[in-house]
Amino acid sequence: MAKLLIIDTALEEAIVALSKDGKIIAELTNKETHSHANFIQVAIAQLLATQKLDIKEIDAIAVTLGPGSYTGLRVGLASAKGIAYTLQKPLIGLSTLSALAFTAIKLVPKKMEQPFQIFSMIDARRMEIFGAIYDAVCNPILPEQAIVLDESKWNSLIHQPTICIGNGITKTKEIKVAQKVIYLDAMYTSQELVEMAMIKWNAGHFEDLAYVGPNYLKEVYIIPSK
């Protein structure tokens, strides 16, 4: 069965993990946002050593493409592409918003009113979020996009009972809405990432190394150093 290397540096906490047969067998995390780049290589070496694996035994590399931290996305994808290219292994791209929806489905109250939708949201500073809406089986309803939240916009998106998940939910709790809303104070874990990655692995859905890039959802402005 497939052995995967999972790299996630999209958000504040970075994750590097190894999986086998769709289950996490080892992982390391790093909460120091500014050191994610150094953490990745050190973590990979440590995990391979503890599992007595050679990196050539890895069947594919899975990496979060975003949305999330611009810098985090760049360093994570650069590392993943470098490994995939060197080893000639497939690269699997993962969405952070889809991962949140995948997580929400596991946490949905059993008596949740049907039908319902899942609103994944990641903090994008000020009153803006990166968001997407999914149905009860993770099919997209509203495509991933940057959203400026206000009462009018919020109510235009909530047409039915809604489960909100992600670190952007704090921006919505005080906004009045007509529909029932449940807030899940949760984030995805490495296990959700590997389960999503295995779906793509089994389907043969891999990224083209020449063209894949971070999914920023917003234009990136880089200020030249003086």
What are these regions (language model features)?
Residues 31-39, 70, 74, 78, ...:
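Residues at secondary-structure transition points
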Residues 60-96:
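DPxDG-like acidic metal-binding loop motif
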Residues 23, 90-186, 216, 221-222:
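Surface "functional belts" at beta-alpha junctions
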Residues 1-65:
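N-terminal beta-alpha supersecondary unit
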Residues 183-226:
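Acyltransferase
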Residues 47-51, 86, 104, 190-201:
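Stable alpha-helical structural segments in soluble proteins, enriched in small hydrophobic residues
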